[in-house]
C-alpha cells in the first residue's frame, strides 16, 4: 500500500527522524503529498517530512 494512503489531514504524528531539532515533537498533518507531508508543530512552525521521518500516534 502507498504511504500517502496511510495518513490523512488532521492526523497526529510524532517526529522520529529529522535533520533539525524537532525529534520527539508531536505535530498535526496539514498536507499529504505522495512523497512527503507538511506537519504543523506545536510552536506553529510548518515542516516538510518524508514518510520515514514520522509515525502515527496510537488512537
Regions found by a protein language model. Give the residues of each.
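Basic/aromatic-rich interaction segments and small domains that mediate binding to polyanionic partners
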Residues: 2-59
Amino acid at each position: 500500500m502507498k504511504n500517502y494512503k496511510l495518513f490523512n489531514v488532521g492526523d497526529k504524528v510524532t517526529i522520529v527522524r529529522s535533520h533539525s531539532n524537532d525529534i520527539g515533537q508531536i505535530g498535526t498533518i496539514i498536507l499529504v503529498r505522495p512523497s512527503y507531508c507538511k506537519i504543523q508543530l506545536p510552536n506553529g512552525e510548518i515542516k516538510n517530512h518524508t514518510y520515514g521521518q514520522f509515525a502515527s500516534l496510537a488512537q
